[in-house]
């Protein structure tokens, strides 16, 4: 959904491991798409693997935009797939800012494997109004909410 919502005048380069995002970005007239990775995780539709992590580690990105599986004010960002976790960790480390996008039912939940502490995330985007009381704990932890 994020890729579909981009301004048609946006001129940018997106490095992505997401097959779905790459397809959407490719339809945009002024976006260059760089697909990273070699092995496809069928559950997440992301490319994963050591070569993907190594490629990401060589990039300096302005923004890291992540879809979330679980986000909790105490445990942080978490996932249940080890290889996806390694990709997301590398992406966060390679970026100046991190944006997490997810539906509200993913909030206040935890998966088995930690990706990042909450203080490594700058912005949270959900379908909720930014002033919704459910988002208040995330604001108190320093996240900007949209």
Q: What residue ranges belong to the model's regions?
A:
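Short active-site oxyanion
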Residues: 9-14, 120-123
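Short helix-capping segments at alpha-helix termini
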Residues: 8-10, 28-29
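Conserved phosphate- and dinucleotide-binding cores of soluble alpha/beta proteins
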Residues: 19-146
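Glycine-rich beta-alpha loop segments
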Residues: 1-7
């Amino acid at each position: 959904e994020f890729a579909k919502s981009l301004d048609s005048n946006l001129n940018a380069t997106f490095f992505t491991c997401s097959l779905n995002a790459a397809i959407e970005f490719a339809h945009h007239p002024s976006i260059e798409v760089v697909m990273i990775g070699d092995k496809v995780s069928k559950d997440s539709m992301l490319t994963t693997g050591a070569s993907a992590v190594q490629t990401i580690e060589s990039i300096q990105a302005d923004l890291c935009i992540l879809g979330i599986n679980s986000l909790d004010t105490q445990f942080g960002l978490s996932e249940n797939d080890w290889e996806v976790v390694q990709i997301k960790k590398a992406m966060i480390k390679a970026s100046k800012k991190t944006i997490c996008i997810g539906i509200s039912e993913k909030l206040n939940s935890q998966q088995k494997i930690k990706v990042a502490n909450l203080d490594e995330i700058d912005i949270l985007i959900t379908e909720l109004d930014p002033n919704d009381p459910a988002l208040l704990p995330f604001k108190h932890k320093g996240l900007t909410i949209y």
